[in-house]
């Protein structure tokens, strides 16, 4: 089932994939990394002027990484704002996604955190560097295949 934004994008020949609706009824779309920046600009011009949040997650060990954007379309005189969730998947071996910092400035720290924790490189981000972990840290702590250095599991402590 396609939502209103998916239909609108399809009429304009913009490549995407509808992932349905989440439990709150928010439309979820998948965008390819190479199409993400241009579609982000189009969505901003269309009225999605507020980036509510950006996060990332590891889909499966050895699998894809996902960058998730929650956008809101705020208009004067409208009681219920439109919301959409955009998912951009990338391979962990070459995890590069275009940054949307120049579209929504509020994604600055959020893309940096996704880089720091999962190693997703956001192309054209002006300050893409670690934000939570020290610069000397090796690896990406939130990847499912990450092995913590000097971690020892204590089985039977008593």
Swiss-Prot record:
Record has Mitochondrion as a keyword: no
Protein name: NAD(P)H-quinone oxidoreductase subunit J, chloroplastic
Reaction it catalyzes: a plastoquinone + NADH + (n+1) H(+)(in) = a plastoquinol + NAD(+) + n H(+)(out); a plastoquinone + NADPH + (n+1) H(+)(in) = a plastoquinol + NADP(+) + n H(+)(out)
Location within or outside the cell: Plastid, Chloroplast thylakoid membrane
Ranges annotated as spanning the membrane: none
E.C. no: 7.1.1.-
Name of the coding gene: ndhJ
PANTHER family membership: NADH DEHYDROGENASE [UBIQUINONE] IRON-SULFUR PROTEIN 3, MITOCHONDRIAL, NADH DEHYDROGENASE UBIQUINONE IRON-SULFUR PROTEIN 3
Organism: Aethionema grandiflorum
């Amino acid at each position: 089932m396609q939502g209103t934004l998916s239909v609108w994008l399809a009429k304009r020949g913009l490549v995407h994939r509808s992932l349905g609706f989440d439990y709150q009824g928010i439309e979820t779309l998948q965008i390819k990394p190479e199409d993400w920046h241009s579609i982000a600009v189009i969505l901003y011009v269309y009225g999605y002027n507020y980036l509510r949040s950006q996060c990332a997650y590891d889909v499966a060990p050895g699998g894809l990484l996902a960058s998730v954007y929650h956008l809101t379309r705020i208009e004067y005189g409208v009681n219920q704002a439109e919301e959409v969730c955009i998912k951009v998947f990338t391979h962990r071996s070459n995890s590069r996604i275009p940054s949307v910092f120049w579209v929504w400035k509020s994604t600055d720290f959020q893309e940096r955190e996704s880089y720091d924790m999962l190693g997703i490189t956001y192309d054209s981000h002006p300050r893409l560097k670690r934000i939570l972990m020290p610069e000397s840290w090796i690896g990406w702590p939130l990847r499912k295949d990450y092995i913590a250095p000097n971690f020892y599991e204590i089985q039977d402590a008593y």
